C-alpha cells in the first residue's frame, strides 16, 4: 500500500505542532509523530562550556526510537487496507512527522513525499519562546547562547538538501498557514492517487 509522508520542520515556536494537528483534523487517514516525544532524559543531555544543556542537537533525541515508531506506522499502514468502505480503502495513509531537527537526519532523507519548513524572525522567535514553559526551564541567556545559534547551524546544513522543501512564513496566521499547506497537500495527494491508479 502506498503511503504519503509529510515533514514539518522549522525553528522553535514557529507553529509546527499546531500546523500538524490542524492538518491531522482535516486529512483522512492521517497520523502524527512528534519529534519532541523522543527527547532523552535530562540526565543524558550534554552541557556545553557555558553550562547550557544541549537540547537543540540530534544527540539530545532518541532518533533510533523515533525511526522505530515510523517503521511501525509504515508496517501497519501496509496492512490496513481492509475496509468495506470503498472511499476509505482508496485513501492513502498519511503520516505527518513534525520536529525541529528532521531534514538534517540522513536516515529520513528518502521518506519525504512533501517537506515544509517554518521560519520566523529572531525577535518573534525569542518573544514566543519567552511565553512558553519548558521543563527544565530556559536559563538566562539560553536562547541567544544556544537555541538560536543551533537553529542557524541547522539552516546552514539544509543548504545541502537535494529534495524540495517548501519554506513557510511562520508569522502568518494559523488559518493562513493551514490553508496554504492543506491546498498544497490536496494537489500532491491527487497526483499520488493518479500514479497509484496507473501503476
From Swiss-Prot:
Residues that, per the record, bind ATP: 10-18, 128, 132-134, 172-174
Residues the entry annotates as binding substrate: 36-39, 55-56, 129, 134-135
One biological process term in Gene Ontology: NAD metabolic process
Involved pathway(s): Cofactor biosynthesis; NAD(+) biosynthesis
GO molecular function, one term: nicotinate riboside kinase activity
Leading EC class: transferase
Keyword Signal: no
Domain of life: Eukaryota
The protein's name in its UniProt record: Nicotinamide riboside kinase 1
Lineage, highest ranks first: Eukaryota, Metazoa, Chordata, Craniata, Vertebrata
Gene: NMRK1
